């Protein structure tokens, strides 16, 4: 890795501590100790702030202090979870199960290159922009800022996945109906959120970045659209997890990574930086379509294809209208966003009513 001289040992310790904390958190979540998980989340946030203040403000150790603060916070979290959940009772070093270990490795090994493929989709955009275009490094800096809105979608998805994965594994009765219903609500939330964020794209960048970086808004719409299908593809990856078919996860991710590299080379030369954003969207769309097809043999889920197609068409139209700055683009984009809201309102309203009923009980 570039610019990591002298930090390799620290990075290894960071990975060890971070994964140890994640292991404890997953184990506690599997034991259905959700309140403890919530308390740990709050404490981890507080300790992260305190350690950052300690290393950066008090001790003034420089940028490496951010990494040290994260390590210290994760270590405290792991110790807290191990002690509060009494995980020592579940730790039996002498009861090694070789057969179970082989099963776990067979499932886990394809996940490593699969994750690398997702990183290729992200990093290849920057690599191609920086090297194929004139003033590529400057344009890549703008492209980096354009990920800001798409990252909001990813944060929402990560919060959802934290709660969703456990339910996906434990909910066995009526699983197909359960997955279909959750997917319908999830795609509604994703498309409504994306339509609203695309509509607010220009004012967001006017406030969020300086004047020199304002033009980054032009590349954000297609990246936001790509984030939607990245999240939907991640949802379908849960089916692979439930059925222990991680090899299919690797196959679809690899196809997306190859597609992204090819499209980047073609579209960036044709469209400029927005070619990279469009390539990202099309790559995530390919991953979603492949997963929607090959998960049919694992779990017959209702994707509501017509609704999905209309949502996509409205959002693509909104993105194109905004990027092309057509006359009265604000009005037309607002109408597209309103169409997405109207199309998905029923599912969200039903979910809200159900949550309110549970709360009253």
Q: What is the role of each PLM region?
A:
Residues 63-67, 81-122, 167-177, 297-312, ...:
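Interhelical loop/hinge segments that connect adjacent transmembrane helices in multipass membrane
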Residues 301, 321-361:
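Membrane-proximal transmembrane or re-entrant/amphipathic helices at the cytosolic face
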Residues 1, 5, 10, 157, ...:
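Alpha-helical transmembrane segments of multi-pass membrane transport and lipid-handling proteins
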Residues 58-59, 116-152, 167-170, 202-212, ...:
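Helix-terminus/linker motif at the lipid-water interface of multi-pass membrane proteins
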Residues 5, 63-66, 100-107, 111, ...:
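Interfacial/gating helices of multi-pass transporter permease domains
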């Amino acid at each position: 890795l570039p610019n990591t001289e002298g930090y390799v040992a620290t990075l290894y310790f960071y990975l060890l501590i971070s994964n140890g904390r994640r292991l404890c958190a997953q184990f506690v979540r599997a034991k259905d100790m959700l309140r403890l998980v919530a308390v740990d989340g709050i404490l981890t946030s507080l300790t992260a702030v305190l350690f950052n203040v300690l290393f950066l403000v008090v001790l003034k150790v420089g940028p490496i202090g951010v990494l040290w603060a994260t390590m210290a916070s994760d270590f405290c979290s792991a110790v807290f979870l191990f002690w509060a959940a009494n995980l020592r009772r579940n730790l039996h070093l002498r009861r090694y199960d070789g057969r179970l270990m082989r099963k776990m490795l067979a499932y886990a090994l394809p996940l490593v290159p699969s994750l690398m493929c997702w990183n290729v989709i992200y990093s290849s955009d920057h690599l191609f922009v920086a090297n194929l275009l004139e003033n590529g490094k400057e344009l890549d800096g703008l492209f980096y800022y354009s990920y800001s809105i798409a990252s909001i979608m990813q944060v929402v998805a990560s919060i959802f996945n934290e709660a969703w994965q456990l339910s996906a594994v434990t909910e066995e009765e009526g699983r197909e109906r359960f997955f279909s219903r959750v997917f319908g609500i999830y795609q509604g939330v994703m498309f409504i959120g994306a339509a609203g964020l695309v509509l607010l794209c220009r004012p967001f960048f006017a406030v969020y970045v300086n004047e020199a970086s304002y033009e980054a808004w032009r590349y954000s719409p297609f990246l936001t659209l790509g984030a939607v299908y990245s999240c939907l593809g991640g949802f379908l990856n849960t089916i692979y997890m439930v059925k222990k078919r991680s090899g299919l996860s690797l196959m679809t991710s690899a196809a997306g990574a190859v597609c992204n590299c090819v499209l980047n080379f073609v579209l960036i030369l044709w469209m400029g930086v927005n070619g990279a954003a469009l390539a990202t969207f099309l790559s995530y769309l390919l991953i979603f379509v492949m997963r929607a097809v090959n998960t049919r043999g694992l779990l017959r889920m209702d994707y509501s294809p017509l609704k999905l197609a209309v949502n996509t068409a409205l959002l693509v139209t909104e993105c194109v209208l905004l990027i092309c700055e057509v006359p009265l683009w604000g009005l037309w984009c607002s109408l597209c966003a309103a169409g997405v809201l109207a199309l998905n309102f029923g599912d969200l309203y039903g979910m809200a009513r159900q949550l309110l009923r549970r709360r009253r009980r």
